[in-house]
């Protein structure tokens, strides 16, 4: 697949006026996302506007990369790119500005994102439903990694869920193809990827020759969040994020992570010493299932070479013990409104460890979001 990566072309673009915009559902550095419907068929879609203002040399490389990748990836658990549209080109356009129209990526519409669902205290996931969410998420990662693509921005807001309960990995704006290092020459990918709270320790230490384990760390953060209802490590800076990781996963040392001292930043940063690994201990107040705790623990391994991959994760006992994964459709059918992070109140953050849940007998997956602040 990687061989075909640079040869993909996208065909003639229709005008975006064929769609009627209904509501804005997303905003970020990438641009805006709108819910829309096809004027003739009524089909609901999501329109992702490509920001062009700062592009002096033509079409943004990040958008081009996203389009090429999404044309190659076709899987039930990956968002589907329908087409690329543009605004009407001015009749006065010439050879120099004929491409200045706004470009939109058109996707199948998904009613929710996971961050929006977790922000709503009325949305209660059972253990079976959490298993289904994580099974679909890991299936999506298995597929993209098998096809030599890294997502590089795993977070709850980039996990979409349809009204029928089908999960879709979304926002491939930071994604890229990867390959094994050639002729002993390491890859030199940018490490300025992945939202800080979900960024793995190898990227924070400056690694540029990385691979699928960076996405699995994000999957571990998301899995824990299914119970805590908010991101588990909310650092303010890269140094702070590494400190939070050390406090949860244990001190970063060559004993637990061979050759970690090769990183220049490892010598420069003041990392916490003498920290014990406490992933299971800190999460057991929220996560009562022992298999779930064990899988989170294996996903949040400091050394990327020892971190569990998507194939082994899908074969973990968590997915093959009672209660088995169950469909989300019935639970979602009780919620008529779409839920997106952009439309939800700001996710709370604070500087202290929250109190233990008051009622331990209650299902931790169904605990009211208002009881928690930052977890770690």
Curated annotation (Swiss-Prot):
UniProt xrefs under CDD domains: STKc_CDK9 (cd07865)
Gene Ontology BP term (one): positive regulation of transcription by RNA polymerase II
Subcellular location: Nucleus
GO CC terms: P-TEFb complex
Gene3D superfamilies: Phosphorylase Kinase, domain 1 (3.30.200.20), Transferase(Phosphotransferase) domain 1 (1.10.510.10)
InterPro entries (UniProt xref): CDK (IPR050108), Kinase-like_dom_sf (IPR011009), Prot_kinase_dom (IPR000719), Protein_kinase_ATP_BS (IPR017441), Ser/Thr_kinase_AS (IPR008271)
Matching PANTHER family: CELL DIVISION PROTEIN KINASE, CYCLIN-DEPENDENT KINASE 9
Subunit (UniProt): Associates with cyclin-T to form P-TEFb.
Protein name, as recorded: Cyclin-dependent kinase 9
